[in-house]
Amino acid sequence: ETEQSDITVAQAYLQIVLARCIGKLNLVEKSNVGSNDLIYQTVSYISANFKKKFSLEEMAKDLGVSKYVLSRLFSQIFHRNFNQYLNDARLNYACYRLENTRDSITNICLDSGFESQRTFNRTFKERYKISPSDYRSRTLS
């Protein structure tokens, strides 16, 4: 009998604790969870694939969303379009390689996902206002 009453008291205390905890929880609407999940998937996808050639359409297909949803995500969350975000990932990697290796600029350019050195040089100069070779010289000195 005392064992049963101990269980009843324990259950009552547990219900009080749970009731207090529920009030502290931050509940999130399902639509926001999905959106955050897509943001995570987008960042992960680009991090894993920026060295390859791929389009917004291919990425959207792989993630199971329309290219319009993905395009809007880039605009609203990242405040840049798909190509700008992808080039940022590629440029960040290229800068790391320029600063930390003696690899040729051509190899760095191609390994970073750029299709040509001309595109790489133009994109790099637009972003950093300096050529990749000058950037390397300044960071290594």
Where are the regions that the model predicts?
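A ubiquitous short alpha-helical element
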Residues: 30, 57-58
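Helix-turn-helix
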Residues: 59-67, 71
